[in-house]
Structures are given as C-alpha cells and as structure tokens.
Amino acid sequence: MKGMRLMPMKMKAKLVVLSVGALWMMMFFLVDYAEGRRLSQLPESECDFDFKEQPEDFFGILDSSLVPPKEPKDDIYQLKTTRQHSGRRRKQSHKSQNKAALRLPPPFLWTDDAVDVLQHSHSPTLNGQPIQRRRRAVTVRKERTWDYGVIPYEIDTIFSGAHKALFKQAMRHWENFTCIKFVERDPNLHANYIYFTVKNCGCCSFLGKNGNGRQPISIGRNCEKFGIIIHELGHTIGFHHEHARGDRDKHIVINKGNIMRGQEYNFDVLSPEEVDLPLLPYDLNSIMHYAKNSFSKSPYLDTITPIGIPPGTHLELGQRKRLSRGDIVQANLLYKCASCGRTYQQNSGHIVSPHFIYSGNGVLSEFEGSGDAGEDPSAESEFDASLTNCEWRITATNGEKVILHLQQLHLMSSDDCTQDYLEIRDGYWHKSPLVRRICGNVSGEVITTQTSRMLLNYVNRNAAKGYRGFKARFEVVCGGDLKLTKDQSIDSPNYPMDYMPDKECVWRITAPDNHQVALKFQSFELEKHDGCAYDFVEIRDGNHSDSRLIGRFCGDKLPPNIKTRSNQMYIRFVSDSSVQKLGFSAALMLDVDECKFTDHGCQHLCINTLGSYQCGCRAGYELQANGKTCEDACGGVVDATKSNGSLYSPSYPDVYPNSKQCVWEVVAPPNHAVFLNFSHFDLEGTRFHYTKCNYDYLIIYSKMRDNRLKKIGIYCGHELPPVVNSEQSILRLEFYSDRTVQRSGFVAKFVIDVDECSMNNGGCQHRCRNTFGSYQCSCRNGYTLAENGHNCTETRCKFEITTSYGVLQSPNYPEDYPRNIYCYWHFQTVLGHRIQLTFHDFEVESHQECIYDYVAIYDGRSENSSTLGIYCGGREPYAVIASTNEMFMVLATDAGLQRKGFKATFVSECGGYLRATNHSQTFYSHPRYGSRPYKRNMYCDWRIQADPESSVKIRFLHFEIEYSERCDYDYLEITEEGYSMNTIHGRFCGKHKPPIIISNSDTLLLRFQTDESNSLRGFAISFMAVDPPEDSVGEDFDAVTPFPGYLKSMYSSETGSDHLLPPSRLI
C-alpha cells in the first residue's frame, strides 16, 4: 500500500519553534503522521485488517495465543470458578484468583479472565507482587477527561456508510472493555463533542476533551483502518503515545540515527507534569505505541528497539488491531470505572453480582423465602468488601430495546432503597430516566427500556452480612412502537456488525398530528436479489402490514429519502438463514409540508422536500440563482395567433448542450391548426420503425382542449421528420438530450392554417382530417369512402379475428389483389395479451411514401389508434407486435397497379399495456387459462396504467404457480416505476393468493416468468383505477428543481389511451 505524506517536513520542523500558544496546542492536538505513513511499511495482514469477515468477535483472525475464550452462555463475569473433573464447583478465594490470573510471563496475554481480575482487583499484583507506581502516558489534567466517561459524537456527511460503520465498530471496541460511553450527540445535552471529519493533518485528534464545543477527529486517506481509528480515539479519551513516557528508556531504545530528518520531535519524552502516574507497567503491546520502524529513513531500519525481550516472545510493537491489556486497565483507571461490572454488547446474557453464586459451604446458593442470611459468619469470610459498587452497561443498536428478567434479588431493605439497591436506568448514564430502584427480596421482575441502552448500578454495602445481591438475565429485542417526537435513529440488529440470520424486526412509528414521518438511510448493505426475496427492508405508509407499500429494498444501493403521507410509518426488516451483510442505519425525522404551512416565496411552484422545500417553474421557464423566481428558458409558450415563425434547438447552429430539456407549446387561434415543417434535423440516434430513441429525441404531441396529450411521434437521428399538424389549436414539442453525444439539433418552421374540420366536421359523414389548405374525409371500420369524398358505404372485405393464432392473406393471394378495395382485419385477443403479426410474403405496389396501395397497421381497435407502420413495396416488414390486446390492419388499393399482396401469420403473446379505468377488468396469465395450464419458458411483461391523478389497484381472483422457496422457478413479480428507482411490491409463487396491491404512482409493472419444468393453472387478476391516498409524495424528497416544462407527457393509444395531464400534475 502506498503511504500518504500528511504534512511537509519543513512544516513539522517549524512546530517546535512556534509561540508558547502554539506549543500548548501541539501538546493537546496530536498529529499521527506515522499512522498514514506506516501503512506502507506494515505487512499486508496488518494494513488491511478486514473487520467484517470475522465470524463472531473482534479477535477472530488473531494469533491463537491472543484469542479470548468464548463467553459461556451462563456468563458469570464478576467471579470466575474452576471445575473439578467431578463436575462440582470448587470454592476459590478471590485473592488467590487475582494471584493466579496475574502470574503471566511477558508479554501479557489478554483474556476475559485477565480483564475480569484487573477490574475486580483492589491492589493489582504481578507474579504475586504489588505493581509499583510507574509513569503512564495519560493526561494529568483532569479537566481533559470526559465527564462521566460520556463522549458524544457526530460524523461528517462526507463519509460513506461503510466509513460510519467502521467508526462505530471502533467506538464499540472501546466501550466493550471500559466504562466509556460513545453516544450520538444531543445538542440539548452535549455542548462538547467529537466530530469525525477530514483535516489536512490526515490522522489527528486532540488530547482528551478540548472543552470548546466541536472537537475534530480527523480520519483522512489511509487512516480509515479499524486499529488506526481505535488509536485516534485513544488520544480523544486522553492517551498520549506510550513511547513518550518518562520511563521509556528502561524498556526501549530510540535509534535516533535511523529517524527521518526533522521528525525527531515525535520521540520526545513527556514531562511528569504532562502525564498521570497510574499503577501499570510499560506496555509494548499498547495500541498507542509506535511501531519499530515509525519515521524510519528506510523500512529496514528500526527507530525503536525493545529491551530485554526473551527470544521467541510474540511481541506486537505498534500493533493496530485491538486494545492491549494495559490499554484497557489504564482507561478504566483514568475514568474511575467501577471495581466490578462490565459492558454487554451481545443479544442476550446473564448478569450475576459478586458473592451471589456462593453460600457459606461453597455451593451455589438458591436462596428461598425472605430469611436473612446475615447470620452466616462463614459466608462473610468469603466476601471481598471492595466489590460493593458495580456497574453493568447493556448496549444494543438504535431501534432495539433491552429486556431485563430479574430472576432473584436479595439486598438489605430500606425506605426508598436508599442504602443498598439495584438501580436500573433507561439510557447510558446517571441522568437517564430512572426505571426502578429495588431492594429487599424480589424475584420474577421484568423490566424493559424504551431506548437501546440499559444502565445497572449496584450497591451492596452489607454483602458481608450475607446479602448476596442478584441474578438476572437480559435479552435484546428489535422493533416495537416508537413515538417520534424528535429525530432519532434505527439500525439493523447487531449494526455496525453483520446482522444475524433468520431475523425479523417490525417498527411502527407514529408522529404527532399534522406531521409526516421521514426516513433517510445513511448506510445500506443487504443481500442482493432482483426481487428482494431473501433479505429486505419493507416500508409502508401506516402502522400495519397491509398499509400502502412505499417500497421494498435490498442490495447495496442507498434507498431514496422516504416520507409518509400520514403520520405513521411501518418498517419491516427480514433476513433469511444464508448470507448476512452489514445491514442498515437510518435516521427517522419529523417532517411538515412547508409549502402548506410557510410563506415559501416561490414565484411559480413550491415542491415539498425532506425537511425543506424547493421552488420550481412552469413550462418554458428556468429557476434563477435566488432559488425562487423564474425566467424564460429554452422552450416556452409561443403565441402564433398573429404570425408564423420558427423553432430552434438550444444553441443552434452550434451543438445543443448535454442534459437539456425544453418544452414548446405553439398556440394557434381557435378553429386553426399548427403545421410544422422541418428544414434541418440532426439528433443522436437512428430512428427506424424497429428502433427506439433512447438518447436524444424530440416528441411531438397534439394538445387537446381538455389537456389531453395525443402523441404524434418521437424522432431522432438525421432524417427529416414528416410534416406534422395539431388536431386542434396547440402543438407541443418536448426536446431531451442526455449526458453524452451532442449534435447540431433542428430547425422547424410553423405555420397556421384554418381548420376546416372544426366547422360542421368539414361536411364529412364520418371523420374529417385537416390538411394544409384543405381537409380529407375518412370512414369508420367496415366502410369505404364514396366517390363524392364525403359519404361512406359499407364494405364487405372485413375480418374480425378472436382466435389466438392463425394464418391470413390478402384477397386473391397469391394472385393480384383487386383494385379500389378497402379491407381491414381487426384482431382481438384475451385481455392482458397482444397480437404479434409476422409476414412471410409481401408484395404491394411500391411508392416512397406508400400513397397508392399500402398495408397500414395500428396499435388498437381502429385507424385512430397509434400507427405501428405503413408498408408497401416488395420487402417483408419486420414482425409487428401490439401493445394491447387489439390490433387493426388495413389493406387499401387504388385503381392503378396490382400486386399479389401478402401472406402472414398471427399469434397471441402474453404481456402488453393495460389501461386501468374506474371499472374493474380482468386479465389472465395465458390465453387458454381455465382449459390448459400455462406454457413453459414464458416471459411476460404487463404495464397497467391509470390516469395521472389515479392509482392502480389489483386483486387476485385465482393464483396457482409452481412453488419454490425463493420463487426462483416460476413467479410473478410486481413493481412500479419511481422517480429515482423502482419499487418492488413482491415476488409471488405457490397457491396462496397475494394481497391486494395499490400503487403509489399511476403505473404498475408485472412480470410473469416460467421455467422449462412444471406448469400449473396460472392466475386471474382484476384491476381498476382508484383514487390515491391524500396528496403527498412518498419517494425521493431531495430531488433537484424540475426542468422547464417538467409536466412530462404521458401517452397511450386510443384503447382508452390518451391521458389527462392537468397543469398541477408533477411527473
């Protein structure tokens, strides 16, 4: 790994000659230059300590001699016992335990037993001898220690979710072995706090508490390692570097000749006025110690050499893996942690007070009744009087609660339990709400916190009289009901470690009236699956499992910001038995609609966002720099009532910009139409009848009087579009460019013409179509135009086709078709399926624009539907497929040349577009539903769409699909398109009908896929349009201000396909 230089050498050298004030700052702001540089000198195993891949605890990949033993299920932490082979418990005095546990050859091997003994020991000993006072590298200034051992923190938003998880892992590591508590900062409680950020110093932090409010702890490039963060937190807690102790020369040799020039000051010794003097020896294994080659001229030259280390000793000088034994004891002494107790971070465990497990005869005692055991003098001799004040800290993740089962308690009774007691608080410190204070004889109590932490303070001054204390069991549960009165966080179970298998958590959050619940994910990493069938987070607008689904999320992509429409939110987290990931961390916030309750000052539109609002503009305008007023932009409303004119793409004749969106509406006088003729056209892409314009494109609509947009066409490439005209008096153009290729754009001239069809239908019996300077009449299906050009007569060449497959051909095929005929074929298949038409032979009189003889195919029930293609000549068209369950085809010939016509086959395919209306409709999994099972290897997509102001509701009438545990074989998957990402409603299989589903938007997407094996009956689904819940947006509230003309068009064909688009609809 490549190291990073954190500060120029000259700058570092100047630090030693600065003013007295600068020296004072240097004393308390530690720059760990070595932490960034040393990474290039460490073995890969030390540099890349992968904390996530450990099976269960922090020590999973360490040397076996340093691995603490697993905690037994019945964890009795305060007093360890040995077991004889007979299985009986053997009594052992507390003093002898201390001696046995501390007779360890250097280096000291850290185990839970050692921690336990050191925490209990009243007089620490080594090899049976008291530890002498020696200098220890912790701050001597008591005001620099954090009050009550509570260190509030905030994390800069520049860090990723993985970084935030790593910071929390390091903080939990300190908490696990000390009484120090790292808590998320509450501005109302915590004036001083640390702030994880990035400074120019790279890896650096203040020594202890600064006392001036926000206190940075810099985790820069190459510093984001688990051990390095523990090291920097050590400085924050109050630790100097270990090698800066005054007695260090008795334990190490500083090889000054090997130190980089200008970096010698990093090895200076601190004065006695700067360090405390606890009762601990020099610690070569401290995480606060430099490595042997820190600031070395060369990786092969040592700057630090230990003294008197026996050959073969495993020494980890400068290790950045974990706290050493000495680090832990030193921190507990510095913060005056209780002589007994510990921190629990697991999901369940047992807590037993000192003395409880022994009676006078050395056998585990289960006292009964209310008798007083103080009369047993033999018991008194076994008790250590120093173990009368203990503190246990149970720490869960945000969104979890702690349940304590108090199995037995035996303490001296007193009024209000003022003498001896067990005090339980809902939180992390003495100011947290008091839940219970208990004394006397109690059993069977159950106590639950409302937060994710529980604090137990235990006082038993009369233990020597036989009051044995208590025994309890705790468990951590996730989910529950939350009353949201201020911002708070929820995390997946065990976060920031991997969540556990087979876990299900449900949170029901309720905000005050006139508020909404907002959710913002800060970290997200779940097992990935297309249908989120394995591990997922499901969010609903309400407080129960059948409330409106907002989204189901999995994978590692951060979900969008989410806000409910009501004042309640339902969050469900599920994990399966296989893959576990980091999980998630999210912030819950109260939110109000600022557009309703504040003077927003937006000139045009106000758009509510998460915790704020944004202003937007109407079509043809752009938001100015002040964020409130709007100005003219590309596009706009063009008044064509007085003269003709031209439209140009942005920047023409230069190339148009990237990421541009423009909307024009050309408005003609009443009873007039707009005609548009292109003289130049050059956009990215190639527009053929079998391709789509996916990059840059121009869409043209005819805007109807009721605001419906009827699509005329979408165009890209370099071929000139045909002359187009509006059906009524408004023509709408929408231009879009992406972020890549740019072209020269387009020029189009518009002219205004009287719409002859607007008066008395132009005299046409059936239909009138306006043309430039004139008009044309046409007839409905089954009729042909009479010689007078206005009236219609019935034709006999018409075919209504309702079968699911077949063959068709033109009249007289393979001979020449007749002259002057008008034939049509109307295909109609089962709802939810569509017709695919394939030509096998095709020969129709040729013309560049097919104005003589032609075959025209329409996507719907008549010629008024969208055109799929108009064909002539001798080339077989590509296969044509409708988007709905109807297709209309016309063969029209004139009095001139004749050809043999065509032969084609048609087949009904699943999928397509479905228009949801106020009336319930039903579609099926396959055309022959009810008589035959569905086919193998099917792949079907349906798009069910309602009007823009409505939602889609689907209900399953029958459901029978091959079952598999993951729905991997045959399945129906239901999603909907969102502004930033798709929402997954679920993947279904088996024989149980899925629940009713109501979309958040106006569209639902259904995908039915089957494999090559078993086939069952299939499904039947009814669908209809319904009113959505009260107005609000349930997806991404950090969206940027919409582009001018953000009233993005929606379109479908005549099969109930023209969509109403009122000006208030935001797409």
UniProtKB/Swiss-Prot annotation:
CC cofactor: Zn(2+)
EC number: 3.4.24.-
Keyword annotations from UniProtKB, A to Z: Calcium, Cleavage on pair of basic residues, Developmental protein, Disulfide bond, EGF-like domain, Glycoprotein, Hydrolase, Metal-binding, Metalloprotease, Protease, Repeat, Signal, Zinc, Zymogen
GO molecular function, one term: calcium ion binding
Catalytic residues (UniProt): 232
Glycosylation sites: 176, 441, 543, 644, 677, 791, 864, 918
Coiled-coil blocks: none
GO biological process: amnioserosa formation; dorsal/ventral pattern formation; imaginal disc-derived wing vein morphogenesis; maternal specification of dorsal/ventral axis, oocyte, soma encoded; positive regulation of activin receptor signaling pathway; positive regulation of BMP signaling pathway; protein processing; proteolysis
Classification via CDD domains: CUB, EGF_CA, ZnMc_BMP1_TLD
Gene3D superfamilies documented for this protein: Collagenase (Catalytic Domain) (3.40.390.10), Laminin (2.10.25.10), Spermadhesin, CUB domain (2.60.120.290)
GO CC, any one term: extracellular space
InterPro entries listed in its UniProt record: BMP_1/tolloid-like (IPR015446), CUB_dom (IPR000859), EGF-like_Ca-bd_dom (IPR001881), EGF-like_dom (IPR000742), EGF-type_Asp/Asn_hydroxyl_site (IPR000152), EGF_Ca-bd_CS (IPR018097), MetalloPept_cat_dom_sf (IPR024079), NOTCH1_EGF-like (IPR049883)
Signal peptide: 1-36
Comment on bound cofactor: Binds 1 zinc ion per subunit.
Disulfide bond sites: 179-337, 201-223, 203-204, 340-390, 417-439, 478-505, 532-554, 595-606, 602-615, 617-630, 634-662, 693-716, 757-768, 764-777, 779-792, 797-823, 850-872, 910-940, 967-989
Pfam families named in the record: Astacin, CUB, EGF_CA, FXa_inhibition
Motif stretch (Cell attachment site): 245-247, 325-327
Propeptide: 37-136
The EGF-like domain, residue ranges: 591-631, 753-793
Residue span, Peptidase M12A domain: 136-338
Keyword Nucleus listed: no
Catalytic EC class: hydrolase
Residues given in the record as Zn(2+) binding sites: 231, 235, 241
Function comment: Metalloprotease which cleaves TGF-beta family ligands daw, Actbeta and myo in vitro. Cleavage of daw enhances its signaling activity. Cleaves dorsal-ventral patterning protein sog. Processes sog more efficiently than metalloprotease tld which also cleaves sog. Required for normal dorsal development. TLD may interact physically with DPP-C protein.
Note: Mutations in TLD lead to a partial transformation of dorsal ectoderm into ventral ectoderm.
Protein name: Dorsal-ventral patterning protein tolloid
Annotated source species: Drosophila melanogaster (Fruit fly)
Biological classification of the source: Eukaryota, Metazoa, Ecdysozoa, Arthropoda, Hexapoda
Chain's gene name: tld
